[in-house]
Each structure stands twice: as structure tokens, then as C-alpha cells.
Amino acid sequence: MKTNFEIRYASNPIDAKSYDTARLRKDFLIEKLFVANEVNMVYSMYDRMVVGGAMPVGESLLLEAIDPLKAPYFLTRREIGIFNVGGKGFVKADGETYPMDYKEALYLGRGDRKVTFESLDPEHPAKFYFCSSPAHATYPDHLTTRDEAVKMELGTLEESNH
């Protein structure tokens, strides 16, 4: 298991208007989120947001605190939304197991000490995309399945990103 992160600094809005495609991609595009048995993150100076991806293949991946958080564990002062965009898997948070299918979401509130990601089938691994922000209050963890989700389909399938 490997945890990687990079820090992205905010761009001056006036300067950003003059950026070419290469510079825009360098400053804003996040690539390589899903690498087998890695947790990859970008810590952004925009609202101290963390965007990341975890793709467990045959082993459990731990969501570790990264240096910019200056915290003993990842959710010490943060909350996180986790979305499965791959095969079936599950997330464990402080002993509670949340099975997650494709397009299902999990909210974990501030304070969960140990969070791990696992895939049900290494041949079709789960891909957990997550966004985390600072939290100033604690709310209960909650799994939203596809059956429970409020769905709104707009446009046509050919011209959308369903």
C-alpha cells in the first residue's frame, strides 16, 4: 500500500486568465487518481479541500493523515464524501462496514479514526473517489445506495455524462 499526495496552491484569478491549455491542465487537472493499491490525493489551498482516489486490488488501503493536515488521523478535523465509481467494494470506518456498489456514496463525519478501502473482487476493483473538507461539527456517517439516491437525469444519454 502506498499513499501519495501533492499540494496545489491557489492561482491568481487575473493571472489565470492568461494561462494556456498546458498551464490550466498543470494547475487544475488531477490525473492518476486510480492506481492499483495506492491512495492518491491532492491537497488544494482552495478551501483546504482534499480530492483523492483509492483503488484496492487484493489488499486493504488505509486512509492516512497527510502532512498538510497536521493531524493524528485523516478525519480528526475533517469530513469526507466517498463515491464508488468502480466494482463492488466496501469501506470500513471505526469497525463499521459499508458495502458500496457502483455509483453509491458514503458520508463520514468528523472523528472516525480508522478508514479503510477494500474491493470485493480484485479482477473488478472498486474505485473510491473522495472529497474532504474541514469540519467544525460532527454529523453521523451515512451510506446512500442507488435505490435511495434522488436521481435527476437531464439531457440525452448521448450528450451527457450519466
Q: Language-model segments: what does each one mean?
A:
Residues S44-S60, L69-G95:
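Glycine- and acidic-residue-biased ligand/ion/polar-headgroup-sensing regions
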Residues A93-R110:
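Short acidic-glycine-tyrosine-enriched beta hairpin
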Residues D112-T116:
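Short, charged beta-turn/beta-strand-edge "cap" motif at the junction between a beta-strand
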Residues M1-Y9:
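Basic/polar N-terminal segments that are highly enriched at the extreme N-terminus
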Residues F117-H162:
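Surface-exposed beta-loop interaction hotspot
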Residues L62-A65, P99-K103, H142-T144:
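Short amphipathic beta-strand/extended segments with alternating polar/hydrophobic composition
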Residues V50-G52, L106-L108, F128-C131:
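Short hydrophobic-aromatic micro-motifs
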Residues R8-D67:
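Intrinsically disordered, low-complexity, positively charged segments
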